[in-house]
């Protein structure tokens, strides 16, 4: 027993974290897997949410480490987005702790339903489709320029360079005002509850045409990471974190997000998206 929990229970939480980290990397919905797992153990909603916020930090760490190439040269935008995430996370966490717990229990089902709907509408899939079209067009232009013989002689090089053929992220000065409003609201939402927040941020950035998919996804990860870090600090200071569960979840989330990239190249993201939507629907009904 560790702080009242059996080793088996903590292993189950860690395994749920692996799934949450994996799904979080694939569709930005870690909490739709991890939060229900904590509720299933009988953890009160507010404590479950606080512990979950600390736990899914593992997903953020893994995602940020894996997105270093995508964030290269985007330091100013990355710093601003992390700052927005940090401020929004603090506001969301204080909002959660300042309101009556019954308010949280009342609004959770609609929030989960909204998150599930956002995933079902698949903004990431649309971004991937647009990115694939842009890649194909750029690939054709390059092949025409270099000649078909060079393309055939260096197929491995072509494949390795393929992910890097993208347009650049738009300058900050060209961002519409509603992008900043949307990102800020998503950051507050991430600190308050956060399930599906990554998908909502992705939807905002995708709609604004901020940049190619791989860069948008990296920026989305930064916003959520910043919000979760600051919200976690608030929850820790207030003493509402169940540490054994949070640590087990964090370890699992890191592992899941770390192994996700090579696997998601082979498994359709639609499968993970469907799993997240089903989890969200089940929790909403419950």
Where are the language model's segments positioned?
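Selected transmembrane alpha-helices and immediately adjacent juxtamembrane segments
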Residues: 1-44, 132-217
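Hydrophobic, aromatic-rich alpha-helical transmembrane segments
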Residues: 2-6, 10, 14, 49, ...
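Hydrophobic/aromatic residues within the transmembrane alpha-helices of Major Facilitator Superfamily
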Residues: 18, 22-26, 61, 117, ...
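Residue-level recognition of specific faces of alpha-helices
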Residues: 37, 47-53, 204, 215-218, ...
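Small-residue-rich segments of transmembrane alpha-helices in multi-pass membrane proteins
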Residues: 40, 45, 84-90, 115, ...
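Membrane-interface alpha-helices at helix entry/exit sites of multi-pass transporters
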Residues: 43-52, 75-80, 210-221
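Selective hydrophobic functional segments
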Residues: 51-110, 114-115, 228-279
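Transmembrane helix exit motif
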Residues: 61-72, 110-151, 155-168, 282-286
């Amino acid at each position: 027993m560790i702080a009242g929990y059996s080793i088996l229970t903590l292993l189950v939480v860690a395994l749920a974290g692996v799934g949450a980290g994996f799904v979080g990397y694939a569709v930005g919905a870690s909490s739709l897997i991890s939060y229900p797992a904590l509720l299933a153990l009988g953890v009160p909603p507010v404590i479950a949410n606080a512990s979950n916020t600390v736990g899914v930090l593992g997903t953020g760490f893994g995602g940020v480490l894996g997105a270093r190439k995508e964030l290269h040269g985007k330091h100013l935008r990355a710093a601003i987005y992390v700052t927005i995430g940090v401020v929004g996370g603090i506001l969301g966490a204080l909002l959660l702790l300042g309101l009556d717990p019954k308010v949280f229990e009342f609004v959770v089902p609609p929030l989960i339903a909204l998150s599930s709907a956002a995933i079902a509408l698949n903004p990431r899939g649309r971004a991937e489709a647009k990115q694939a079209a842009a890649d194909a067009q750029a690939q054709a232009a390059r092949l025409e320029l270099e000649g078909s013989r060079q393309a055939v002689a260096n197929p491995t090089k072509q494949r390795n360079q393929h992910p890097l053929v993208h347009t650049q992220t738009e300058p900050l000065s060209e961002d519409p005002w509603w992008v900043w409003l949307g990102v800020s609201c998503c950051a507050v939402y991430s600190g308050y509850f956060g399930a599906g927040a990554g998908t909502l941020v992705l939807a905002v950035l995708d709609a604004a045409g901020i940049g190619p998919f791989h860069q948008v996804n990296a920026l989305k990860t930064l916003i959520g990471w910043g919000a979760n870090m600051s919200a976690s600090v608030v929850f820790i200071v207030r003493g509402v974190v169940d540490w054994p569960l949070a640590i087990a979840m964090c370890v699992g989330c890191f592992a899941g997000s770390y192994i996700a990239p090579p696997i998601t190249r082979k498994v359709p993201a639609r499968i993970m998206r469907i799993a997240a939507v089903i989890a969200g629907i089940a929790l909403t009904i419950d």
